[in-house]
């Protein structure tokens, strides 16, 4: 590694000896991992209304710790589809906080009465939140969608996030229903493309998946009701699935006891088996997959705590991926989710970003080793060592 770039990767015996200044003996070395769906919200309970109730200064303080936890778990890059990530990235890049590379989308774009419209609050409050550059932006009509998209670009968004279907944590909508009209989705994608940004589409229902693909969205987040026809459409469009099986499992297992609203629990419990079946279809059909968790809460004793990202790999293997292919979703496939904003990263190869981790055991033989941050013994981000044994 030379500064932030890998200058050689291969057998140690063939390494250019005049360039070696330090050596480390580790069992396994691999690229730093990507979580392509995590929200820096700074809340301790997975409830959209909780974000409204939490002072922004408290949220901001919490996510600094969340970023550190992600890096210590071996995740050197986070793609954040809605939250405070655009601001956190600035602080990390200034060297004032320790964390991964953060590629934020700014606010989530939602139609009125959509997934990211917090239905239990007055609509004026939701619009006020957008005006204060909060984590959601409700917009309607082509003009409104253009303004919302440009607002995120003004904040420095690396991509755009849109809700193309209903969701779980939103109180009154149906996850199966399409959200935004086709022309609204096309306007958002077209405006993002003018700025070399891709669009990530939150989609549970098939109508939203197909509409998002037809509009040109690069990634489908969740894909709960994906079937063979939708999988074929994803392949034809060269789109990427970010399945987030982790959050489904965590909500079903721990949601009620960790304060997730009853309406959300009813939705996720009804969808859980379908979500796994959709992931299996995607794997069988050969859809490109990038790892994402939908991690969003601060603190270890919460429903989806930062630092537990590696658990998603077990879910991918259980759904049918070979361990090496699962690892690829967290490494080489991660940058695919950012289009032309992606760095040359995710591989141990000359010229790639020097994001590297060492692991106590070969994850190809035991994928669960990556679920425990303690098994990640070393972390280099852009060539700088951030973690090593004491």
Model-derived regions, located:
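Histidine/acidic residue-rich metal-binding segments in metalloenzymes
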Residues: 144-241, 250, 255-260, 269-289
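Active-site mouth loops of central-metabolism enzymes
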Residues: 48-61, 126-147, 198-200
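Divalent metal-dependent hydrolysis catalytic cores, especially in the metallo-beta-lactamase
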Residues: 62-88, 99-108, 157-171, 198, ...
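Metal-associated gating/positioning segment near the N- to mid-region
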Residues: 27-94, 112-119, 183, 215
